[in-house]
């Protein structure tokens, strides 16, 4: 009864008002799974291709009718009659039919929407929650944990129209006893930060991921105002709350000059100098995780960064690894970073995403489940984080319903699972156990 009898796709809007693909997968027993593909702003050059129409007369060229047509045509034809419980088989049928390394025939946005909708339909057919079905197909049935959130409360870089070069300044409520309380810690600090910024006469407008996006004198000032907000909310920095950053350094790397150019504060660095700049920040503040601290192609620089800080803090590869097992394996073999950011649409299917998480864990890396800056109300990443016991999730700030949808789903899951999904706090972060 879990055979696929129909697949439908449509163009819907993401949180930036750009089109994306939503797919419905209908099974013989009447189960229907629906899923939307997210979209990134600061993207790695090796990511799977997000297929856009390029027709400037519609949505400024960002329409996805070609990807929708791929779902409603060849993908649907290939999957009718297949068993939705056979996730890997279905994903590989789509990958093989596409026939390209980067999914450029159908688009990763088309393949991913169907892949996730299949998983949702299968879970409904089995009458189990999505996180339980994900754990089953991951080969880890019944093994769950609640993730420590990385809450992006100050936005810069490609996620905001301000002068802050580093893209994300995040808090992690590592001292909370459970996820529900972690969310409360974060929300209270978010509101305290709004008052701190307002009292300084700074903007409290928010960026793509719901964090505040003020103009600041330096990137370090972002950490200073967060420190003030943590104290104002009644929490202890370094004990209750730790800090994390996503530099998205590829966005301010000058490839021709081989320089990291922090235009917002008028500073330029070589690769090694920028590593020491970051290390200095970790000595001033309890920063326990740095993501994409260098350009995605600066592997020598990443080797230096890992030697410099990799035994003390979590060094996360996002643009560096793009959820791709081939690239991740190279990083593992060469001692590059110690953690991977996991984004469904960088690789384009649930099966390949699970493979990347497994490879990371087997190598002693951590895996941080992540949203994209262009999101929808789809909360699948919440179930992915719990169902793979990944331990950490990055899904934005404490406002914008496209972000809060994931937090609310995690609240529901924690309530359902009770003590079966522990919240382990600091020990989930590489170098902090």
From Swiss-Prot:
Pathway: Carbohydrate degradation; glycolysis; pyruvate from D-glyceraldehyde 3-phosphate: step 4/5. Binds a second Mg(2+) ion via substrate during catalysis. Its main location: cytoplasm. The keyword Magnesium applies. Pfam families: Enolase_C, Enolase_N. One of its GO terms (molecular function) is magnesium ion binding. Its cofactor is Mg(2+). GO terms for biological process: glycolytic process. Mg(2+) binds at residues 246, 291, 318. Component of the RNA degradosome, a multiprotein complex involved in RNA processing and mRNA degradation. Belongs to the enolase family. This is Enolase. It comes from Marinomonas sp. (strain MWYL1). The lineage of its organism: Bacteria, Pseudomonadati, Pseudomonadota, Gammaproteobacteria, Oceanospirillales.
